[in-house]
Regions:
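Helix-loop-helix hairpin linking two adjacent transmembrane segments in secondary transporters
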Residues: 142, 151-199
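Extracytoplasmic gate region of multi-pass secondary transporters
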Residues: 45-46, 216-256
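A late C-terminal transmembrane helix in Major Facilitator Superfamily
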Residues: 330-365, 371
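Paired small-residue
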Residues: 104, 115-124, 303-311
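Conserved MFS/SLC helix-loop-helix module at the cytosolic interface between two early adjacent transmembrane helices
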Residues: 76-113
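C-terminal transmembrane helical hairpin of 12-TM major facilitator-type secondary transporters
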Residues: 277-323
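Helix-to-loop junctions at the C-terminal end of transmembrane segments
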Residues: 77-90, 265-278, 359
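Cytoplasmic helix-loop-helix junction between adjacent transmembrane helices
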Residues: 120-154
Length: 390
């Protein structure tokens, strides 16, 4: 049987076939709900870890292990289940992950010992990773993936902000485990919502596609490298401010400005994401981040530091949805998007470590130069994709 000719999208990268209809609004909303569930702990990690440290009398090291268990397990499970999940219905994958998230979070009501809590947070992370697989695949198969990921990011930030504000109240009135109960309550509708997860290809067809073509490797490497730069810059933003002789209050103003710029950029991307190609959006985000780290590198006063922080965050927020949108075009099954998300998380974690030798040799002022080189390298990997077939 002859298959239909491939459609062309994003300057030459092969798009899904005409028989693979994009998912609709219900699948979009289901994917957004899944993304919020999967990232809920990460959104409130600093406040949550502080609460656990004070209420359960944990050490800072123990709190760090809990954070690593939760977020690390989500990243590893997402990457590990990306390909195997292609053999099952997407709704089944979503339900399995949701059940694990529900059980692990509710079980936190029954424990106080560090070992038991560590095991439950590890299990919750695995569940969140499985949910991530389902929701990223659902979002990547939307007719405008960049716009879908931007909408999901905006809702994630809104939910995280609300929960961060609520945690002190919940802790004061209902105890330290109340936050996990809220997360479980928000996740519970996922058992019903899972019916709206739609895969644009049959499970076996999705599982059989080659995720890592040359274009897939290049996109994965570019996203991972870019997030090394992002992680290194963000982790050392305070040090760069001190290098510019700014006070803690001034640095806080810059961080607040950047925190506002992120949602603004995400909202704008959600509005225009369907009108701009992934490659063009990636290019704009990359160039904007390059401008931001350049300003931070030359910042000798507060105005330049403020501008650099805001511009960098704006570019970062634009870059992410378009990067995931590009992986969706390269691999319509969504598996590459899941693995690329894990690569981005890994790069963000490795970035501060990569910056350590440069800081030891040349001081914190070397970070913007390192970030510039990494972002430029990532951009160099993206540019050839306009001539590449997936």
């Amino acid at each position: 049987m002859n298959s239909p000719a491939p459609l062309e999208s994003d300057a030459g990268i092969e798009a899904p076939s005409a028989t693979a209809a994009p998912t609709g609004r219900s699948a979009l909303l289901a994917g957004i709900h899944g993304m919020v569930v999967a990232t809920s702990v990460g959104q409130v990690l600093p406040v949550l870890m502080t609460t656990l440290t004070s209420e359960l009398h944990l050490t800072v090291t123990q709190a760090g292990f809990l954070a690593a268990a939760d977020v690390g397990a989500t990243t590893i499970a997402g990457a590990a289940f990306a390909r195997p999940a292609g053999r099952f219905a997407l709704s089944t994958v979503a339900r399995v992950g949701t059940v694990i998230v529900l059980g692990a979070n509710l079980a936190c009501l029954l424990v106080t010992a560090f070992g038991a809590l560590f095991a439950l947070r590890l299990l919750a992370g695995v569940g969140a990773g499985i949910v991530t697989v389902a929701c990223v695949i659902a979002l990547s198969q939307n007719k405008s993936p960049a716009r879908a990921f931007a909408l999901a990011a905006f809702v994630q930030m809104a939910f995280g902000a609300a929960l961060n504000v609520a945690i002190p109240f919940l802790n004061a009135h209902y105890g330290w485990s109340a936050c996990f109960v809220v997360i479980a309550a928000f996740a519970a509708p996922g058992l019903w919502i899972a019916r709206y997860y739609v895969r644009s290809q049959a499970p076996q067809a999705a599982a059989s596609r080659a995720t890592f073509t040359i274009a897939g490797w290049m996109a994965f490497a570019a996203l991972s490298i870019a997030f090394c730069a992002i992680g290194a810059t963000w982790a050392n933003l305070g040090g760069l401010g001190e290098r510019s002789h700014l006070t803690v209050a001034m640095i806080s103003i810059a961080v607040s400005g950047a925190s506002i710029a992120g949602p603004v950029a995400t909202a704008l991307t959600a509005l225009v994401g369907n009108r701009v190609s992934s490659l063009l959006g990636l290019g704009f985000g990359s160039v904007t981040m390059l401008a931001g780290v350049t300003l931070l590198g030359f910042a000798g006063s507060s105005p330049l530091f403020y501008a650099g922080s805001v511009v960098f965050m704006f570019g970062w927020a634009v870059y992410v949805p378009y990067a995931l949108g590009l992986t969706s075009v390269i691999d319509p099954t969504g598996a590459l998007s899941v693995i690329a998300t894990a690569g981005a998380n890994g790069g963000f974690s490795l970035g501060p470590l990569i910056a350590v030798p440069a800081i030891a040799e040349w001081g914190v002022g070397a970070v913007p130069y390192l970030a510039f080189a990494l972002i430029a390298c990532a951009l160099g990997l993206i540019v050839p994709l306009q001539h590449t077939k997936a």
